[in-house]
Amino acid sequence: MPSVPSDEEFLTYNRGVIDEFRANHGVVTQPPFPVLLLTTTGARTGRRTTVPLGFAVDDDGRVYVVASKAGGPKHPAWFHNLRANESVTVELGAGSFEARAVVTTGEERDRLYRRVAGDDNAYAKNTDRVFPVIVLDGVPTPASGMHISQPQKTG
């Protein structure tokens, strides 16, 4: 079973991805799939925090992310933040957009999750929790070259 990175490992990795993303107008070398930057407001602190996340696009052109935290036992902090305040900022490519984070449920959640996890649900094998799927309402459909067409994992 693959190990889940520590919080410090996540922070160090994320800082590098964020810096590269902003320096190159949304293009990064790692991870090996398209990413966006999600900025949430801290539920307790009120401080704005940014994380890089893999994303997917559904058939209706909606951009969404999965709160997997690499299969860790707890939801990522950014998910708790957007549950407290659904207003988020999304950086995608060279653009920045104000959006509303909508946590999906039931059949919609399951359908969207299957699109990114496919049959290889390795992250889910590490934990008993259900990974939340969040639609970022207000983010325009990215250019076709940024679509994730194969199952990918998100942060």
Across the structure, where does each feature detected by a protein language model lie?
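Generic, well-ordered alpha-helical segments
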Residues: Y13, Q30, G46-R47, A70, ...
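C-terminal edge-of-domain segments
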Residues: P2, A122-G155
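A short, polar/charged loop/turn motif at coil->beta-strand junctions and beta-hairpin connectors
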Residues: T29-P32, V130
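Extreme N-terminal tail/first-helix region
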Residues: M1-Q30, A143, G155
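N-terminal short leaders/motifs
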Residues: M1-T12, T40-R47, S87-S96, P142
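Short beta-strand segments
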Residues: P32-S68
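Short helix-to-loop capping/linker segments positioned immediately adjacent to catalytic or ligand/cofactor-binding
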Residues: H25-G26, T45, N121-A124
